[in-house]
């Protein structure tokens, strides 16, 4: 059995179970977070098609990510979470799937859904099994403890990281995800993670972030890429963002911003900041 051990415990988030739970709960109760703890184990509401959370260290983006997971907690528990993020390392394939085994965090193990992953590979024509793209990547790893806090180990994952940020890849993955749900009846939610603009002064960074969030809410994946290109927005995950938007379009659902902040709002350091979204689709 393949095991992916945590690569960023102790850096992006605490390395011990006790401290990690405290950090997650602090994210929920933080002034920039939802302000309350989530319902654990799943709720009775309608689950979203997709979410777009950030993926920085918990001390920076944890409170904004918590808005996503609070909202998720109100809906019925998914059996499968398709995790989609940007590949920051440059290793691996254009779209890399970790296809079997388990992922570990300080909160325990989560099983990879091999059959759902196989279907995404088949349907997308671009996603392929590849461990190398995942070994040191943080964008998906930081989502797992939040999911484990909600559901324990009672869900499976399909982890995909995208190296080539293109509209075509976004559309292919979104359509594969749509078929997974609609043709195969898989009770799944897509968690497509990206940070927003990077490393500009507070006001300029915020201006670019709000332009991108407006494009996301339009519900058109092409508008996401056009806005990023037209305004030189350095979001790290255009493909995950656009895939979530396209998944919503296919299901007849428009994105809705749950929360937004940047690192300057958290730390008070505004010389250069990074933007963090929380979006429900």
From Swiss-Prot:
Pfam families: Memo (PF01875). Belongs to the MEMO1 family. This is MEMO1 family protein APE_1771. It comes from Aeropyrum pernix (strain ATCC 700893 / DSM 11879 / JCM 9820 / NBRC 100138 / K1).
């Amino acid at each position: 059995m393949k095991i992916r051990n945590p690569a960023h415990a102790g850096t992006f988030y605490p390395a011990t179970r006790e401290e990690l739970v405290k950090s997650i709960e602090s994210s929920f109760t933080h002034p920039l977070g939802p302000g309350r703890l989530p319902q654990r184990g799943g709720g009775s509401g309608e689950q979203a098609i997709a979410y777009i959370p950030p993926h920085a260290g918990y001390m920076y983006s944890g409170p904004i990510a918590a808005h996503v997971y609070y909202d998720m907690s109100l809906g019925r528990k998914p059996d499968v979470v398709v995790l989609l993020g940007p590949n920051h390392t440059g290793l691996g394939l254009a779209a890399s799937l970790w296809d079997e085994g388990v992922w570990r965090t300080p909160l325990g193990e989560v099983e990879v859904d091999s059959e759902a992953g196989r279907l995404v590979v088949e349907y997308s024509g671009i996603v392929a099994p590849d461990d190398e793209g995942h070994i040191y990547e943080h964008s998906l790893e930081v989502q797992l403890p939040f999911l484990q806090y909600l559901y324990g180990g009672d869900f499976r994952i399909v982890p995909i990281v995208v190296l080539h940020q293109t509209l075509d890849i976004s559309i292919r993955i979104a359509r594969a995800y749509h078929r997974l749900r609609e043709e195969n009846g898989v009770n799944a939610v897509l968690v497509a993670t990206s940070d927003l603009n990077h490393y500009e002064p507070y006001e300029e960074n915020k201006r670019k972030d709000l332009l991108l969030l407006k494009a996301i809410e339009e519900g058109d994946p092409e508008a996401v890429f056009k806005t990023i290109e037209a305004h030189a927005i350095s979001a790290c995950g255009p493909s995950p963002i656009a895939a979530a938007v396209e998944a919503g379009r296919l299901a007849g659902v428009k994105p809705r911003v749950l929360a937004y902040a940047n690192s300057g709002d958290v730390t008070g350091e505004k010389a250069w900041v990074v933007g963090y979204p929380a979006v429900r689709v």
